[in-house]
């Protein structure tokens, strides 16, 4: 279904109510709206998120929020396994009620709601997936679940994995959702994602061709991907703020902008920025180790540790903050921080949204991944993009060591490789901006996608 010129085209986006899932959808909605004034976009998520989304500070995005029931009682804690099982049972029926209210030309689904494409097909509506991880991660998942390539025993983390257009991997580098240690519900979720691709017409990816060109080309004869990123705020791309479409993220935790005043007082390329994302709790022993390394080096730091985490109480960290060496935030305006000239490097968990932001900002990374797609993102950052180093736990006791933290920070700021890393980071920053400039690779892909969904 489509719409002729001048008529309004309705698009429905569907995602789970996680910050790292909603923000890429909102950024895509912004690009679509700027490219075509005739698009009307609804963003659907589960009813239990209504209160949460009503309390956060909302950017001005060109979407209307709609909600559907997840089938669970309001007081249910919504553990991932329980939520996914319930949505598999009732999601299709409840989302259909929303679909029947309008004549939608296209549905854009998160990969983590894999039941949605079949719903779209049942209503004779074309469906796209917005893949919110790396093209490299998509390639691994596709080749594994669709059995197009051979994989070793995934119980043995030391086994090597050889795949087209990727560096030689070990099993430990693969996304944790496909590993036995990741749990059956996550493994099955990705199997359902691979299966749902038969109902999907477009796989849109939050990346850009110049960043993952070989990986993108390697998928061309399988299930092609369409890079339409980087999906970041306009100011990070060097654009002026739009009067009606400002560039703020949707933050479930209130960020502390006071840190920007502190950054303004720091020397150029002097501050280590540390953030391990919104999903996992920071471990006290890791915080103590990293803090000791910063203290030994006398490096100023800006560190995000979520509210009520015990890691905020680590004595050496509190001492350093009291002495003025650094600042600890409960949540941060990350894109603003990464674009500040005082930042020297980013110690990151390597989530894909953070990876895109640091690539566009041109900031070198110390990669310290934990789970999901983070391990393969770390390999890409270090071995493909060439803008950082990998920080590893000790091979004997599995603990992070002070010496390892110091080695990694020195490597991206002062060591012999630092010049090449900074040069490469600056080059990717330039190319990322070009991708979404007029005539850029991602802009052309977005224009073609809009043309597809608006043709009568």
UniProtKB/Swiss-Prot annotation:
Catalytic EC class: transferase
Biological process, per Gene Ontology: regulation of auxin metabolic process
Signal peptide: none
UniProt EC number: 2.4.1.-
Keywords noted in UniProt: Glycosyltransferase, Transferase
UniProt cross-references to Pfam families, sorted A to Z: UDPGT
GO molecular function: indole-3-acetate beta-glucosyltransferase activity; quercetin 7-O-glucosyltransferase activity; UDP-glucosyltransferase activity
Cysteine pairs bridged by disulfides in the record: none
Positions with a binding annotation for UDP-alpha-D-glucose: 278, 332-334, 349-357, 371-374
PANTHER family: GLUCOSYL/GLUCURONOSYL TRANSFERASES (PTHR11926), GLYCOSYLTRANSFERASE-RELATED (PTHR11926:SF1264)
Family (UniProt): Belongs to the UDP-glycosyltransferase family.
Functional note: Possesses low quercetin 7-O-glucosyltransferase activity in vitro.
Name of the molecule in the record: UDP-glycosyltransferase 84B1
The organism of origin for this protein: Arabidopsis thaliana
């Amino acid at each position: 279904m489509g719409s002729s010129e001048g008529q309004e085209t309705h698009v429905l986006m569907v995602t789970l109510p996680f910050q790292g899932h909603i923000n890429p959808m909102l950024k895509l909605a912004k690009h679509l709206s700027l490219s075509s004034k005739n698009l009307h976009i609804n963003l659907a998520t589960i009813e239990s998120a209504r209160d949460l989304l009503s309390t956060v500070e909302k950017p001005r995005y060109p979407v209307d929020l709609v909600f559907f029931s997840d089938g669970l009682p309001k007081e249910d804690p919504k553990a991932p396994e329980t939520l996914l099982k319930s949505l598999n049972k009732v999601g299709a029926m409840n989302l259909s009620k929303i679909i029947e209210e309008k004549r939608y030309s296209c549905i854009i689904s998160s990969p983590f709601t894999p039941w949605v494409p079949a719903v779209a097909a049942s209503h004779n509506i074309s469906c796209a997936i917005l893949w919110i991880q790396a093209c490299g991660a998509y390639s691994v998942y596709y080749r594994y679940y669709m059995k197009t390539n051979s994989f070793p025993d995934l119980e043995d983390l030391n086994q090597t994995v050889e795949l087209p257009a990727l560096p030689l991997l070990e099993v430990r580098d693969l996304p944790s959702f496909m590993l036995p240690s990741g749990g059956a519900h996550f493994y099955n979720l990705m199997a359902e994602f691979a299966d749902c691709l038969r109902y999907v017409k477009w796989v849109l990816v939050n990346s850009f061709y110049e960043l993952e060109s070989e990986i993108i080309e390697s998928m061309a004869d399988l299930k092609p991907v369409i890079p339409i990123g980087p999906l970041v705020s306009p100011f990070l791309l060097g654009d002026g703020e739009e009067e009606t479409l400002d560039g703020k993220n949707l933050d479930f935790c209130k960020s502390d902008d006071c840190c920007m005043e502190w950054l303004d007082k720091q020397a150029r390329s002097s501050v280590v920025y540390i953030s391990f994302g919104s999903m996992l709790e920071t471990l006290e022993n890791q915080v103590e180790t990293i803090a000791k390394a910063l203290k030994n080096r006398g490096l100023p730091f800006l560190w995000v540790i979520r509210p009520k985490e015990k890691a905020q109480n680590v004595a050496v960290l509190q001492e350093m903050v009291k002495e003025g060496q650094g600042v600890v935030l409960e949540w941060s305006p990350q894109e603003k921080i990464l674009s500040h000239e005082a930042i020297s490097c980013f110690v990151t968990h390597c989530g894909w949204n953070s990876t895109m932001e640091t690539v566009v900002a041109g900031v070198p990374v110390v990669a310290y991944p934990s789970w999901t797609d983070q391990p393969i993102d770390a390999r890409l950052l270090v071995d493909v993009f060439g803008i950082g180093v990998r920080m590893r736990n000790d091979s004997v006791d599995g603990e992070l060591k002070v010496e390892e933290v110091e080695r990694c920070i020195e490597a991206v700021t002062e060591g012999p490789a630092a010049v090449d890393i900074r040069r490469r980071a600056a080059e990717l920053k330039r190319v990322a901006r070009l991708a979404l400039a007029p005539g850029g690779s991602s802009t052309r892909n977005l224009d073609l996608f809009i043309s597809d969904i608006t043709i009568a």
